[in-house]
Structures are given as structure tokens and as C-alpha cells.
Amino acid sequence: MPNVQKTVVKKSHKFVIDCTAPAGKIVDVAAFEKYLHDRIKVDNKVSNLGSNVVISKDKSKIIINTTIPFSKRYLKYLTKKFLKFKQIRDFLRVVATTKNTYELRYFNIGDSESQE
């Protein structure tokens, strides 16, 4: 019987965090990219990205490409921590718009005032 080698295909995941709504006003996208680069853990180690996780910036969007299993929920957690760190968590929220995309949006304060 011939020896058959199985090849393992690595799935790549692409996640997007869209900061277009508050882009130029209060969120510094470059600082957010650096924050993610410094805080994302790979194999339980911070700043161990290597070629497994690639973080890039496109105007007001952060794009994270991974070849390892990676949780979208972990990106939401880090985004909320960044907003809290910059003390803008009271104004912005993180909303999932598609399967692989998060978006920063302002809270709808005007709707709650009109209902009263």
C-alpha cells in the first residue's frame, strides 16, 4: 500500500473593524492599530504575532488577517478595552454588522429622549 501524505490546508480568517463613523473625530485609527498589535495574544503570549496574525490599516478600517484559529469575540473585547482606555466608551459602542465585521457606532441618545 503506498504511503499517502495528507496536506493540511490552513484556513485564513479576515476580520474588519470599521471606524468610519467616528473616524476623524475621536478615534485615532493608528493608535488603535498599535494597541491591537501590542495586546493580541498568540499562544498565550503578547506581541507574538509573527506571520500568523497580520494587522493592517486602510484609511478608517482595521483589517486583521489570521492563519490560526482566532475569535471574533476577542477582537470585540480588545476594542471595548481600547475605548475604555481612551475614555470614549460612554459615546461609542461596538456592533457586529456582518459575520466578520465590527463597526463603531455612536449611542442613540436622541431616541431615548424623544420617548420620554
UniProtKB/Swiss-Prot annotation:
* High-level lineage: Eukaryota, Amoebozoa, Evosea, Eumycetozoa, Dictyostelia
List the coiled-coil residues: none
Q: Can you name this protein? A: Large ribosomal subunit protein eL22B
What InterPro entries does this protein map onto? Ribosomal_eL22 (IPR002671), Ribosomal_eL22_sf (IPR038526)
GO terms, biological process? cytoplasmic translation
What's the family? Answer: Belongs to the eukaryotic ribosomal protein eL22 family.
> What PANTHER family does the annotation carry?
60S RIBOSOMAL PROTEIN L22, LARGE RIBOSOMAL SUBUNIT PROTEIN EL22A-RELATED
Q: Which Gene3D superfamilies match?
A: 3.30.1360.210
Please report the organism this UniProt entry assigns to the protein: Dictyostelium discoideum
| Stored Pfam families | Ribosomal_L22e (PF01776)
